[in-house]
Swiss-Prot record:
It comes from the Bacteria. GO terms for molecular function: protein-glutamine glutaminase activity. Belongs to the CheD family. One of its GO terms (biological process) is chemotaxis. The keyword DNA-binding does not apply. This is Probable chemoreceptor glutamine deamidase CheD. It comes from Nitrosomonas eutropha (strain DSM 101675 / C91 / Nm57). Its EC number is 3.5.1.44. Probably deamidates glutamine residues to glutamate on methyl-accepting chemotaxis receptors (MCPs), playing an important role in chemotaxis. Transmembrane segments: none annotated. Coiled coil: none annotated.
Amino acid sequence: MVDPQFASNFYFDQRLNIDAVKLLPGEYFVTTREMVLSTVLGSCVSACIYDQQSRIGGMNHFMLPSSENSSGFPIECARFGGYAMGILIRELLKNGARKQNLVAKVFGGGNVQPAMVTSAIGSQNARFVKKYLAEYEIPILAGDLEGFYPRKLHFFPKSGRVLLKKLHVSHNDTIAKREKHYSRLLLSTVKPGI
């Protein structure tokens, strides 16, 4: 059975001349192939984790640090960092990565919407990913977290290479609209007691 949270938006990136997959919020992807994993981040965070020896890597894209239902059980949804990090690491290991060879690069966590500055969702996501990786003893080799700008991210899992572009000037509100849309979607799909 295919996991619906496994990214499936494949395309050929002509600028980079390589097969690619675009990750949306709540998705993850693991591969052994030579390709690029791409996403755009606002307050969300992506962890790019790879095995430096076997060259197996993957990325997630989560919206909120973690969540539990009213019974205290974690919600199994990759929109939440706790689940997104766990499933990414499990899939890497299942595909042949070794825990002791895993390293990470982390990005995002920007407080890009004026309303998010007070709730600091981006900062909460950034703190969460750093704490999670420290607890699992996966070193962070590089990253770009927090701030006020969205980011466009390209991760090459076989080499660990990252291309990052901060989107400093945005004359449209596409990212803010997406953040609001995914926040509403998240609230509508997480029901108390589930």
